[in-house]
C-alpha cells in the first residue's frame, strides 16, 4: 500500500494544477471556472524507484451541505479521512477567507498530519503573504506556483519526510489481465449511480443534474475472482450542444477513455428510449472499434406494456449492432448486475480471441464457396487468402484481386460469417482488403545464353519437320 496525500481546499485555489504537476500528467481538468473538479481523482507521484506516493485531487469545498456542492464536499472529506498527509491548499493572491477558516477548523478535528500549501505565489510579495497566513498557526508554510512549477522540489522534499513507508492508498496497477470497462452514455442516464452500486460505496457523485460528472474517474475492483478497472465518464452530447470550455475538455477525456478501454458499456434510459444523443455516443464506441455491451437502465420502473414498447423501439433503433448484447438493469437497486458482468466477459473474450492462419483461411474458403462475390461488369473479385492481424477488435487482412470493386453488402456478409463461425459476441469485426500486385508486371523476360541455345535447337527441329 502506498502513502496517500490529499489535496484539500476551497474551489479554484489550484488543486488540480498541483495534482497534474505532481503526477506529471494532465489527468485532472483545469480551468479558471470554480468547481470544475467534483469526484476524487487518484494519481501516482513517482520521484524515483524507491519513492512513490499516491495523490488524490478533490473538489473544492464550498461550505454547503446540499446538492452538488454538498456531494463534492463529502467526496473531499472522504479523501482527507483516508489520507496519510493532507495538503491544505490556499490562494496567495486572494489571501485568507472565511471559507478557509471553516475548512481549517474541520481539518484540525481530523487530527491528520497537515501542511499549509500556499499556491499562486508568483507575482505577489511572499513576505506579506506569509504574514497574512501566519494566523493559521502552521510551523511550516510552503509556497508554490504550480502553473509555473515553482517551489515543487521543496514541496516534494517536505512531503517525503512526513510520509510513512507504508500507507493506506492502493495504486492503480497495469495488470494486463484486468478488464478495463468504460461506462459511457449521454448525461444523466445513471453511469455514476451504476459504478457506485457495483463498488458498494458513494465513490462517484450521482445527481439528477445533467453533467454532474466532468472528469473520467478510474477505480480498480475485484469481483468474483476477476480484476476490473471501472471508468466513469462524463456524458456525451451532440457537438452542436457542447458550449462550455469545461464540457469540451470533458468530452475529450471521455473519448480518450473509450479509446483506452477494452469494453464499453453504453447506458440507455429505458424511460426515454434511444435518442440522437445515444446514437452519438454509440458512434464514438464503434469508431474506436471497442467491444460493446448495452445496459438499459431504469428497466424496473416500466410497466409490462411499456417494456413491450421499449423492446420494439430498441430492436428498431439498435438493429445495426445486432452483435452487441443488451442487458436490462437498475443502477439504483442493483438488479441485472450479474448478467451485465457476464455480457462484459463474453464481449472481452471475443474481442481478444486469437486465431490461426489456417482456420481463418478455411473460414474464408467456406464463405467464398457458399456465397461467391457477385459479378460486376463481367468481372468477379477473387479472395485468395486471409490472415489475422490483431485483436480488440479482431482484425483480418484479406488478399486478392479486384477487391476495390467488392460491395459493402458482401463485406458485411464476411463479417457476419466470421462472427457466426467463431462465435464472436459483443465485438466489432474488422476486415482490411488488399489487392495483390504482380511483381513481374512491366518486366521483359530476358533469356539466359543456355535458354537461347535451347530455343534455337527447338526451332531447327520444328522447321526440319
Curated annotation (Swiss-Prot):
Molecular function terms from GO: GTP binding; ribosome binding
Ranges where the KH-like domain occurs: 353-437
Chain sites annotated for binding GTP 2: 185-192, 232-236, 297-300
Keyword Repeat attributed: yes
Any single Pfam family the record assigns to this protein: KH_dom-like
Residues passing through the membrane, by range: none
Keywords: GTP-binding, Nucleotide-binding, Repeat, Ribosome biogenesis
Record-level GO BP terms: ribosome biogenesis
Domain spans labelled EngA-type G: 3-167, 179-352
InterPro entries: G_ENGA, GTP-bd, GTPase_Der, KH_dom-like, KH_dom-like_a/b, P-loop_NTPase, Small_GTP-bd
UniProt-annotated binding residues for GTP 1: 9-16, 57-61, 119-122
Cysteines joined through disulfide linkages: none
Source taxon at top rank: Bacteria
Quaternary context: Associates with the 50S ribosomal subunit.
UniProt family annotation: Belongs to the TRAFAC class TrmE-Era-EngA-EngB-Septin-like GTPase superfamily. EngA (Der) GTPase family.
Function: GTPase that plays an essential role in the late steps of ribosome biogenesis.
Name assigned to this protein: GTPase Der
